[in-house]
């Protein structure tokens, strides 16, 4: 990640909440700094590519067209993603939450952000909602 994005106070959450636990087996990796996706990567078919994509500082599309598309290429509109780590930690740092604060997150997505917040403030203090059943 970019220098300074992951501040020392967020390092414990980053280490305790691995991104790969919140990334499905079928993904369309993004390109760092760009809103474009590479081709589909399936963990069981290309594990090295999947792991490299998960731990690269880039967004990952996890769903297309509200789940209606499941083909080998790309759908029309990306509808769920796991955000770029530098973006996630920049936003969390700007939020300024501390242990004991209560957080309502709208848009759970893959759940990684909520898990990072839960590590920081306590799981009992985080409520997250998602309209997408997938």
Can you describe what each PLM-predicted range is?
Residues 110:
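Conserved SAM/SAH-binding loop
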Residues 1-104, 113, 119-120:
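Class I SAM-dependent transferase core
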Residues 107:
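Conserved S-adenosyl-L-methionine
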Residues 125-130:
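Conserved SAM-binding motif I beta-strand of class I
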């Amino acid at each position: 990640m970019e220098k300074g994005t992951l501040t020392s106070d967020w390092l414990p959450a980053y280490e305790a909440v691995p991104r790969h636990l919140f990334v499905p087996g079928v993904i369309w990796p993004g390109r760092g700094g760009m809103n474009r996706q590479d081709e589909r990567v399936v963990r069981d078919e290309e594990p090295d590519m999947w792991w490299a994509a998960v731990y690269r500082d880039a967004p990952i599309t996890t769903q297309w067209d509200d789940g209606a598309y499941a083909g080998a290429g790309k759908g029309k509109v990306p509808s769920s993603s796991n955000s770029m780590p530098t973006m996630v930690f920049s936003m969390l740092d700007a939020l300024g939450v501390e242990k004991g604060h209560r957080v309502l997150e709208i848009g759970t997505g893959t759940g990684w952000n909520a898990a990072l917040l839960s590590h920081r403030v306590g799981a009992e203090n985080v409520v997250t909602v998602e309209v997408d059943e997938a």
